[in-house]
């Protein structure tokens, strides 16, 4: 593999045995592609804005004299960029402008004659835009729209598993689900009649819907039944024989062939052998006794030719009298329905008997009564209702997906078709459910991923937008029908508010629009790749059963079987697998390599769950020879959801990668294959809660996906084009672009501005640091700057800690963790948290609130950190209770008259009229002020601090833009200088020419002169662009802010809190091995090895066997080897060994392992590159052990040997307190530990007295309410069991809800008297009141 200059700084040793056929696709594409489809112009009109507009427009007036047509749309540019929106607390959005055409028709002239056309561009609200990282900024906060997994539109056949009826009989049903519109259900009842429901209302006989579709009884029987024909003879009947139909029946007469030979005797069962004999003898007719027809069902109406009387009606059971009547009337042939108990039931015939309607109108009225009970039905209303239910494009849409699924399920070859139902569709569904009831077809599996599809951001936003348009449509239609249209323009017809409201509601408060989890880069990526079955149109937590939540065979390679939350949402919220993507229909697809005749090709096909069922698919770990031929005779593979073994020739596809089945979070766990699934689930989930540490530390034992994840998450700065680093400082990186990658007429400079100390959604710190130096060469895709939790472009969520598995004086009982003081001293787990505190000055009824340093009844010392405007200084160190922003609120009983207001304004406020409502630091917080922002309403005078901040921002903006301009200008001048040198000028001449005149020189060569003129033009453009950018920036900074009604001023103070690790903090490894720190032990007391190196963390060995997460033990061994090799390299550097020896050792390390795919050609590295690599490997060589394809035990032992460590992975340890050796050897090594965002500082609080609940008068609960510890009923039992009566009495009275008792107690304590007199608990009074409310009078007798 070829490594770039920056990748050579540190190379991860990869133990993967399989070649990388396909790179992991861009991880955020599910979000970005979906939204791009929504906002991009689509000439076909099948998706996005175009589809929404075309589905609603043109809007015609009721009279048809005018219509409003849609022409085109365009999205404008956003006013503020993403960062400005976050600071100002506004939505990052762009205005949508739509060109509409109003056409007026001439009433007097011929129909369709146009009288007038007006075209205008109309504003239709702001549409939130997606940032380049797949998020939305709504009201200043970053949000993610989670994709939804919902039931695909189409037709589904199912049964109730025998749960509905007491007999346990299985009842089948069919359901047609449209994308929008009414659901249509068909279901059998226990008596095998077929019923229909519309929108889950009461059921009707299924034949009613067929009658409403204008089918007669005769038509219905013709559709659903084959016929058996009889000829009437004198004493018998002759039946037309279809031999196959007799199978399984018991002969009620002797069955003879043409020659009269008896084939089946009376009373015998007819078998397949008998049928073959009948077919052989070419018997086409069979004479049967007259009574054979009794009970058969007539297939049509039989009418007396003379009188016109109906002798036998269709669907009537035949009797001997009926036969006699027909014989008398001269009817020679009878047709009956072919019904067979085994595989041709009389279901529709029975249904017709239940049906009380006889014609179409009656059926329509019946449907109208069911849909609109209580309304008198009329013919027109009934017809219109039925038409609108399933046959109107406005009200009903199966969608492209629905039609495809519908047609495929019913065996129709064409995937295309209309979005509405046809008569044939409904009949086909009824025929299919009858086929299933007859046992000739299977029901569907609704948890199959071929029946569930993904609805992503773009599609959901489009649906919401359409909802808004439909609301507008009603209003427009009314306005078109009213008023004088000659005066109106399209602008006057459209009200954009409903559209904005629908879109805003979706992005702001939909269940699927979620506050982004921004703990670390991984949590961001996983949140964007989350797939939820909840939400509008989805499941609900309470009603979702076990089957829906379970892992389904079709999840393979599409949804991760590991990563899902614990708790009520388990299985309902899933994560997209690493390689999965959605197809044009919204179904999940996963890639497979094509296999032809047992040879694996490099062709990769994406298959959906529907297609996958047709193929035989082998795993990625199949042994192949050098030509890609499968070596084993029998190969483990999957076919139709089952695992089986097949020969190489039968295999059609093979997995792309062993990590294909799991999500990115799960594939970050090394040795995942050795962990129990439950613990792996916890491990995947807990990595998302890791807090970015002060100094990121790459994992020594990784999986090789760390780099991909860090780059795709968007937290690191990635080079857009190649070149070299021209300038670098803490806040910006300048890259001079390669000549080959330049666009014509540009300066060839890329400037990357870094994000510094910004607050994330979870109050963690986002900070970018350059990881390149001036002069470094850069290629496209190189990481230029690290973000939070990244180290040289690798994801680094935690720290590599030296751990030992051993008990230590009970301090690691029950998963507790003992850590060394050195960990805290070295700031290994120190994190920075940034809190935003806001102070809002409002306009109240009593006057305006004011932000000032003049606060009543506050001493000088409390104001020491405020400036004269009453706002805290940047850099001030504050603690709980300190004032951050001084604010006074007017208080008073009466409202002020205008005269009083004027007098107050002239003579100043009286102190007594205002109360202190300053913003103070919350009690348990201590930190440093890192930023202050002041937002002032337009028209309100800015205070001194606001003006200072504004000037500072303007200065900063000017400085940034000037530097940017100078860099670009330098690039232009540099190129001009090179051009002039090539045209014959020499260095001395050029030095003599002033820089400003360089571009105006004249050259003889015409081509070069043109090039110079282009550079001069470019310079002028840059200058103009600089002036324009600065003006825009300055205007944005100085303009007033658009604040909420009644708000005059907002001051936001940003407080940085540094948190070191301490007892009570939660830590975890990557294998679900979590625990709480019990003690921070002095370094000298920690166990140490023979070399005197102390252990950092001691874990309990009992946490491993029962939990079966052995991966952590292997990680510790491999970590020890990686660190040991790093130590050896460090020693070589320190001893200044020969470079050849160093190169040889590093080469040996990278070449270790069997069949390892990675090839690192250390020989091709320059000496400098080898030294730089060695320096970066001093702390340990990073290794990659991919899931299901990782390092083997043998390789770990080889690594240990190479590091000069015992291959057992265990060593002698000595007690730090006594110096004694421990009884047996201990597993010691390096484990990657995470500090989780469950910090004791955020959880611990104490209360003596505080607020009480109004009704029960008991203390509130929780830190936010400053509540108490609940003493529940189980704790009461404990005190009862101990017989601690006085303690119990105290708990239930004065410490809880005895109002008088607790007040007296408080007074007594103040007086130094520790007596208590318990009274009546308030909750007893509440109980009395509740009993009285039931109408039972209860009195308390206090004698």
UniProtKB/Swiss-Prot annotation:
GO terms for molecular function: DNA binding; DNA-directed RNA polymerase activity; ribonucleoside binding. It catalyses: RNA(n) + a ribonucleoside 5'-triphosphate = RNA(n+1) + diphosphate. CDD domains: RNA_pol_B_RPB2 (cd00653). One of its GO terms (cellular component) is DNA-directed RNA polymerase complex. It comes from the Bacteria. GO terms for biological process: DNA-templated transcription. Keywords: DNA-directed RNA polymerase, Nucleotidyltransferase, Transcription, Transferase. InterPro entries: DNA-dir_RNA_pol_bsu_external_1 (IPR019462), DNA-dir_RNA_pol_su2 (IPR015712), DNA-dir_RNAP_su2_dom (IPR007120), DNA-dir_RNAP_su2_hyb_sf (IPR037033), RNA_pol_bsu_bac (IPR010243), RNA_pol_bsu_CS (IPR007121), RNA_pol_bsu_protrusion (IPR007644), RNA_pol_Rpb2_2 (IPR007642). Its EC number is 2.7.7.6. Pfam families: RNA_pol_Rpb2_1, RNA_pol_Rpb2_2, RNA_pol_Rpb2_3, RNA_pol_Rpb2_45, RNA_pol_Rpb2_6, RNA_pol_Rpb2_7. Belongs to the RNA polymerase beta chain family. The RNAP catalytic core consists of 2 alpha, 1 beta, 1 beta' and 1 omega subunit. When a sigma factor is associated with the core the holoenzyme is formed, which can initiate transcription. DNA-dependent RNA polymerase catalyzes the transcription of DNA into RNA using the four ribonucleoside triphosphates as substrates. This is DNA-directed RNA polymerase subunit beta. It comes from Shewanella woodyi (strain ATCC 51908 / MS32). The lineage of its organism: Bacteria, Pseudomonadati, Pseudomonadota, Gammaproteobacteria, Alteromonadales. The gene is rpoB.
């Amino acid at each position: 593999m070829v490594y770039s200059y920056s990748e050579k700084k540190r190379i991860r040793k990869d133990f993967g045995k399989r070649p990388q056929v396909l790179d992991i696709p861009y991880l955020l594409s599910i979000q970005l592609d979906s939204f791009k489809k929504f906002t991009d112009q689509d000439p076909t009109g099948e998706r996005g804005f175009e589809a929404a507009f075309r589905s609603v427009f043109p809007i015609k007036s009721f009279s048809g004299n005018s219509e409003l047509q849609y022409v085109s749309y365009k999205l404008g540019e956003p006013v503020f960029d993403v960062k400005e929106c976050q600071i100002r607390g506004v939505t990052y959005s762009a205005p949508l402008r739509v060109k509409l055409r109003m056409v007026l028709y001439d009433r007097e002239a011929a129909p369709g004659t146009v009288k007038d056309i007006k075209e205008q561009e109309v504003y239709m609200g702001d549409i939130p835009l997606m940032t380049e990282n797949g998020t939305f900024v709504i009201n200043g906060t970053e949000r993610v729209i989670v994709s939804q997994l919902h039931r695909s539109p189409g037709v589904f056949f199912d049964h109730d598993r025998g749960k509905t009826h007491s007999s346990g009989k299985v009842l089948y049903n069919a359901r047609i689900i449209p994308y929008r519109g009414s659901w249509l259900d068909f279901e059998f009842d226990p008596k095998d009649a077929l019923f229909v429901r519309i929108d889950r209302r009461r059921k009707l006989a299924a034949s009613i819907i067929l009658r409403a579709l204008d089918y007669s009884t005769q038509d219905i029987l013709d559709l659903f039944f084959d016929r058996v024909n009889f000829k009437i003879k004198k004493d018998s009947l002759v039946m037309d024989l279809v031999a196959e139909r007799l199978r399984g029946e018991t002969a009620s007469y002797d069955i003879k062939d043409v020659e009269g030979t008896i084939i089946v005797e009376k009373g015998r069962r007819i078998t397949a052998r008998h049928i073959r004999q009948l077919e052989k003898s070419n018997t086409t007719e069979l004479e049967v006794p007259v009574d054979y027809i009794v009970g058969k069902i007539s297939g049509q109406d039989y009418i007396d030719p003379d009188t016109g009387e109906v002798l036998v009606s269709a669907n009537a059971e035949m009797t001997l009298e009926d036969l006699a009547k027909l014989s008398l009337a001269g009817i020679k042939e009878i047709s009956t329905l072919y019904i067979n108990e085994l595989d041709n039931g009389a279901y529709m015939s029975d249904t017709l008997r239940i049906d009380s309607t006889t014609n179409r109108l009656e059926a329509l009225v019946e449907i109208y009564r069911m849909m609109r009970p209580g309304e008198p039905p009329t013919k027109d209303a009934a017809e219109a209702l039925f038409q609108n239910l399933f046959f109107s494009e406005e009200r009903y849409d199966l969608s492209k997906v629905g039609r495809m699924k519908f047609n495929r399920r019913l065996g129709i070859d064409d995937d295309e078709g209309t979005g509405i139902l046809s008569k044939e569709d409904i009949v086909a569904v009824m025929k299919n459910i009858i086929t299933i009831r007859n046992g000739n077809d299977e029901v569907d599996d609704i948890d199959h991923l071929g029946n569930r599809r993904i609805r992503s951001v773009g599609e959901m936003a489009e649906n919401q937008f359409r909802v808004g348009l439909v609301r507008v449509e009603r209003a427009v239609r009314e306005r078109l029908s009213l008023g004088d249209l000659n005066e109106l323009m399209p602008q006057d017809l459209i009200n954009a508010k409903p559209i904005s409201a629908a879109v805003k509601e979706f992005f702001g408060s939909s269940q699927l629009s979620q506050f982004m989890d921004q703990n670390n880069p991984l949590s961001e990526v996983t949140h964007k790749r989350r797939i939820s079955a909840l939400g509008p149109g989805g499941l609900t937590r309470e009603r979702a059963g076990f089957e829906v939540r379970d892992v389904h065979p079709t999840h393979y390679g599409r949804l991760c079987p590991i990563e899902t939350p614990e708790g009520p949402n388990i299985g309902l919220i899933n994560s997209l697998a690493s390689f999965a993507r959605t197809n044009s229909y919204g179904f999940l697809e996963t890639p497979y390599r094509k296999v032809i005749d047992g040879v694996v090709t490099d062709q990769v096909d994406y298959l959906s769950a529907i297609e996958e069922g047709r193929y035989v698919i082998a795993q990625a770990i199949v042994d192949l020879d050098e030509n890609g031929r499968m070596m084993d005779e029998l190969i483990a593979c999957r076919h139709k959801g089952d695992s089986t073994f097949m020969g190489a020739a039968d295999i059609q596809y093979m997995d792309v990668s062993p990590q294909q089945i799991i999500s990115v979070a799960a594939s970050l766990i090394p040795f995942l294959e050795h962990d129990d699934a439950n613990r792996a689930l916890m491990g995947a989930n807990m990595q998302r809660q890791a807090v970015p540490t002060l100094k990121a530390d790459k994992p020594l034992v990784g999986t090789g996906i760390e780099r991909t994840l860090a780059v795709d998450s968007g937290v690191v700065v990635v080079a857009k084009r190649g070149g070299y680093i021209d300038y670098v400082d803490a806040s910006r990186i300048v890259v001079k672009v390669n000549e080959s990658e330049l666009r014509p007429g540009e300066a060839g400079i890329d400037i990357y501005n870094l994000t510094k100390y910004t607050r994330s959604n979870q109050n963690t710190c986002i900070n970018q640091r350059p990881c390149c130096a001036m002069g470094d060469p850069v290629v496209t895709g190189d990481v230029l700057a690290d973000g939070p939790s990244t180290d040289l472009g690798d994801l680094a969520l935690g720290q590599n800690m030296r751990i030992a598995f051993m008990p230590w004086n009970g301090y690691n009982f029950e998963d507790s963790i003992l850590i060394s003081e050195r960990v805290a001293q070295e700031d290994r787990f120190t994190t920075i948290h940034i809190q935003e505190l806001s102070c809002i000055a409002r306009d109240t009824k009593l006057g305006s609130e004011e932000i000032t340093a003049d606060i009543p009844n506050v001493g000088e010392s409390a104001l020491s950190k405020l400036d004269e405007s009453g706002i805290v200084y940047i850099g001030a160190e504050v603690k709980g209770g300190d004032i951050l922003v001084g604010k006074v609120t007017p208080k008073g009983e009466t409202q002020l008259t205008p005269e009083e207001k004027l007098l107050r304004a002239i003579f100043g406020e009286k102190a007594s009229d205002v109360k202190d409502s300053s913003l103070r630091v919350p009690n348990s917080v201590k930190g440093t002020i890192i930023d202050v922002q002041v937002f002032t309403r337009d028209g309100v005078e800015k205070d001194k601090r606001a003006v200072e901040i504004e000037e500072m921002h303007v200065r900063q903006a000017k400085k940034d833009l000037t530097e940017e301009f100078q860099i670009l200008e330098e690039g232009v001048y540099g190129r001009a200088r090179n051009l002039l040198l090539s045209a014959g000028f020499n260095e001395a001449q050029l030095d003599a020419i002033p820089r400003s005149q360089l571009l105006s020189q004249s050259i003889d060569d015409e081509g070069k002169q043109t090039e110079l003129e282009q550079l001069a033009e470019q310079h002028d453009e840059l200058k103009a662009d600089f002036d324009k950018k600065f003006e825009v920036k300055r205007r944005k900074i100085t303009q007033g802010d658009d604040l909420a009604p009644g708000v005059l001023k907002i001051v936001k103070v940003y407080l940085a809190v540094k948190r070191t690790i301490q007892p009570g903090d939660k830590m975890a490894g990557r294998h679900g091995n979590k625990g709480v720190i019990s003690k921070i032990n002095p370094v000298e007391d920690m166990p140490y090895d023979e070399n005197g190196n102390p252990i950092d963390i001691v874990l309990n060995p009992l946490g491993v066997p029962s939990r079966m997460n052995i991966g952590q033990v292997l990680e510790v061994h491999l970590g020890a080897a990686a660190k040991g090799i790093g130590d050896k390299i460090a020693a070589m550097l320190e001893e200044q060994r020969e470079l050849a020896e160093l190169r040889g050792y590093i080469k040996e390390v990278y070449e270790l392992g069997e069949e390892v795919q990675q090839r690192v050609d250390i020989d091709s590295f320059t000496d400098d590159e080898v030294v730089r690599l060695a320096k970066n490997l001093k702390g340990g060589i990073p290794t990659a052990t991919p899931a299901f394809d990782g390092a083997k035990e043998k390789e770990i032992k080889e690594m240990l040997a190479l590091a000069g460590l015992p291959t057992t992975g265990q060593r002698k340890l000595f007690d730090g307190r006594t110096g004694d050796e421990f009884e047996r050897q201990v597993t010691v090594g390096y484990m990657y530990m995470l500090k989780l965002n469950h910090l004791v500082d955020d959880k611990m609080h104490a209360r003596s007295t505080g607020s009480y609940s109004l009704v029960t008068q008991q203390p509130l609960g929780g830190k936010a309410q400053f509540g108490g510890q609940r003493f529940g009923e189980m704790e009461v039992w404990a005190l009862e069991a101990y017989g601690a009566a006085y303690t119990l009495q105290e708990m239930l009275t004065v410490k809880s809800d005895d109002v008088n008792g607790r007040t007296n107690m408080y007074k007594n304590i103040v007086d130094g008297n520790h007596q208590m007199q318990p009274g009546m608990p308030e909750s007893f009074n509440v109980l009395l009141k509740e009993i009285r409310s039931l109408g039972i009078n209860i009195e308390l007798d206090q004698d």
